[in-house]
Every structure is written in C-alpha cells, then in structure tokens.
Amino acid sequence: MIKQDIFKLISDNPVFYLATVDNDQPRVRAMFLYRADETGIIFHTATMKEVHEQITKNNKVELCFSCNGIQIRISGELTLIDSDDLRNEICEHPSRKFLKDWREKGFFEDFHKSIAVYILKNGIAKVWTMDKNFE
C-alpha cells in the first residue's frame, strides 16, 4: 500500500487509538484525526489532559486506525505545533464545532494555550488484514 492510500484510508476513518507510556505503563485512548497528508498526521488534545503530559515526557507513540477490515498502525515521534493560526483553522473545521463553541463561550481561560496540536512526521506504517495474518 502506498503512502497516499494510507492517508486516504485514515482520513476516511478518522477515529484512531493512540498508545503512549505513563512511566512504565502503556496507555491507550481513542482520538480524532484532524488531517493526514504529505506534511504529516495532525491531531489535537487539551493541555490539561494526562495524554498531553505523557506525550510531553515521551513523544514516541503509536497510532492504530481500523479501516474497513484493514488495520493501520503508525509509529513515530510527535512534535508539538505552536500555531494559533492552526488552532483557529481546526476550530473552524465542520468536524470541530464543539471546539469553536468552547472558544466562543470562553470554556478555557486561554483557549490557544489550552489546545495542544501534534504532528507525526515520517512515521512507520504497518498494514494488517486478516488475509495476511500468518504471512
């Protein structure tokens, strides 16, 4: 499978599971993809969440997408993107209406400091299907 096919599959199936490490304990939770293309895989979380603290301490992660019988695991290192323009772009996206509402209603004292946006560049993807299970 080529990179563009992977970007298309994960963009069409934006819910993924993110694995981090909390001291020596693995942690996994569902996340929501913002964008995946040649620049990288972008998602966000709130800075008060434990996942943000875990990534800050150890930025090596694995993302797992389930795409209609195809599992795509992508490992790599996350980089924090400090861009209010990108945070605002994310808020204006139709899939992130809840963030726009939070920003406009003052849910966070400082919205831009409360949203952490991450990018994974140059990840290593592994594609799995049941048909290829024992290969």
Protein language model regions, located:
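A short, Trp-centered hydrophobic/proline-enriched beta-strand micro-motif
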Residues: 8-23, 61-64
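A short mixed-secondary-structure module that forms the rim of ligand-binding clefts
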Residues: 34-70
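Charged, gly/pro-rich active-site loop segments
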Residues: 73-135
